[in-house]
């Protein structure tokens, strides 16, 4: 049985994968942001012409579910590589953004 992946291990694997192929020179913030946008668009494409009801059931079709998981993985991989290049801790960035949003958009009081 494989271990449950954790973020630092996945980040190391991505860095090692790119380094082994000498891709580091291509991993500029601009290129990674562009690749992230392309992969996000590929995820959107899966849902483009689906009704809301169809989109809610997308994971019930094994072939489509596989495509969705692959695109999610691509988006996450490029986002993590982008963060590594710019020395951004993605979990800290997310936590800080949630804090700002909680202040900016307070929950209604009952």
PLM regions and their residue ranges:
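Flexible "arm" and connector segments at domain edges
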Residues: 1-110
């Amino acid at each position: 049985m494989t271990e449950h992946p954790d973020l630092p291990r996945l980040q190391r694997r991505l860095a090692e994968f790119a380094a082994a192929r000498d891709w580091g020179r291509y991993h500029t913030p601009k290129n990674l942001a562009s690749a992230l946008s392309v992969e996000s668009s590929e995820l959107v494409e899966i849902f483009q012409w689906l009704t809301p009801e169809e989109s809610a059931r997308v994971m019930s079709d094994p072939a489509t579910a596989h495509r969705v998981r692959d695109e999610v993985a691509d988006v996450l991989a490029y986002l993590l590589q982008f963060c590594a290049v710019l020395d951004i801790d993605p979990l800290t960035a997310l936590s800080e953004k949630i804090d700002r949003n909680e202040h900016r958009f307070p929950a209604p009081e009952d």
